[in-house]
Amino acid sequence: MLSKQSIANLTEADLAGKRVFVRVDFNVPLDNGSITDDTRIRAALPTIKDLLSKGAKVILGSHFGRPKGKVVDSMRLTPVGDRLGELLGQPVVKCDDCIGAEVTAKIASLPNGGVALLENLRFHAGEEGNDAEFAKALAANADLYVNDAFGTAHRAHASTEGVTHFLSPNVAGYLIEKELQFLQGAIEAPKRPLVAIVGGSKVSSKIGVIETLLDKCDKLIIGGGMIFTFYKAQGLNTGKSLVEEDKLDLAKSLMAKAKEKGVEFLLPTDVVVADNFAPDANAQTVGVDAIPDGWMGLDIGPDSVKTFQDALAGCGTVIWNGPMGVFEFDKFAVGTEAIACSLAELTASGTVTIIGGGDSVAAVEKVGVAEKMSHISTGGGASLELLEGKVLPGIAALDDR
């Protein structure tokens, strides 16, 4: 397992009076300037509060949206600073930039146990370009570095990788530590049987994770739009369902690899089909060998839900990445919601349940069972890349234990 130094290894003596640059992920959804979901801000609180309690001067840096290296007023972090102040119960000093003399002056006047929030890092092109001069300017206002932004750990940016060349120590925050513990633990030393559920619309976006999981898991459940590429590869009629014609050979090879490795490979046996892609489309449930021409599959059927629930019974660990159907449409959310509820029940009986980022997180939140899972990953692409066994630059840059 990637054994990295963590904030937990730092004492009050290490931190009191020190300027700590903390890379956080405050890329929260906004509606007319109001935050609609503050989950990402709350996820960073354990790290921020720990540093404050040890007398550090905390300097927070985050990206927000995609301003592409220019100042975009609607992407300023002011609403985030206001919400963070409410959650911490103390004022947050808001900077109008993330580098420069004004920022340096504001940080210099911070008391021990004070917090400053830098302006959107991506207002500077040097952030995503991992420009050494920009990274050096960020680091100039700090003594040590904490990365707690798992969602951007798969990117080598100035604030995730570049700054580590100018600061020491460089450690993981509690959020990243938890992500590594669960996601890597599930791949490297899982409580067995290990069952992986992979959904979503395209096989192409999940090839790496499926191939890695076939080497690790005992059962692999496939759902979502990608199932139709597997059906077409088996010679079945898929109607108007989404099929990646250039991935048919790959689908065949993945099924063959599962057989060769003794991994139980489960595809749905029935699907809910619709006459068009709309929330109010006409729908019917059919066997996968009876999909009518002109209809498209938008969810797994009730028999498949039952089969998948039986396959999950008694498992030690479940990793779930990607919905079972078009869960944004209530009519086609039944399969995804049933799996979410099953995982909540399994967690209560001792199964380790890991929701691996992206749409599956939105699904468990929609059903209201997010709190009942063992771990919900805060990364989309980062979660997938970690599960694929890839090196994440933002993690690799941290100090080894």
Swiss-Prot record:
Q: What reaction does this catalyse?
A: (2R)-3-phosphoglycerate + ATP = (2R)-3-phospho-glyceroyl phosphate + ADP
- Which InterPro entries does the entry link to? Phosphoglycerate_kinase, Phosphoglycerate_kinase_CS, Phosphoglycerate_kinase_N, Phosphoglycerate_kinase_sf
Q: Which SUPFAM superfamilies match?
A: Phosphoglycerate kinase (SSF53748)
**Matches recorded under Pfam families:** PGK (PF00162)
PROSITE patterns listed in its UniProt record: PGLYCERATE_KINASE
The record's subcellular locations are: Cytoplasm
Per UniProt, where does ATP bind?
A: 206, 297, 328, 357-360
EC numbers for this chain: 2.7.2.3
* Entry GO MF terms: ADP binding; ATP binding; phosphoglycerate kinase activity
Ordered alphabetically, the record's keywords are: ATP-binding, Cytoplasm, Glycolysis, Kinase, Nucleotide-binding, Transferase
GO cellular component terms listed in the entry, alphabetical order: cytosol
Q: Does the keyword Transferase apply?
A: yes
Q: Which GO terms describe its biological process?
A: gluconeogenesis; glycolytic process
* Pathway assigned in UniProt: Carbohydrate degradation; glycolysis; pyruvate from D-glyceraldehyde 3-phosphate: step 2/5
The residues that the entry says bind substrate are 25-27, 40, 63-66, 122, 155
Q: Which PANTHER family match?
A: PHOSPHOGLYCERATE KINASE, PHOSPHOGLYCERATE KINASE 1, CHLOROPLASTIC-RELATED
Q: How does it assemble?
A: Monomer.
Instruction: Provide the family line.
Output: Belongs to the phosphoglycerate kinase family.
Protein name in UniProt: Phosphoglycerate kinase
Question: Source species, please?
Answer: Synechocystis sp. (strain ATCC 27184 / PCC 6803 / Kazusa)
Organism classification: Bacteria, Bacillati, Cyanobacteriota, Cyanophyceae, Synechococcales
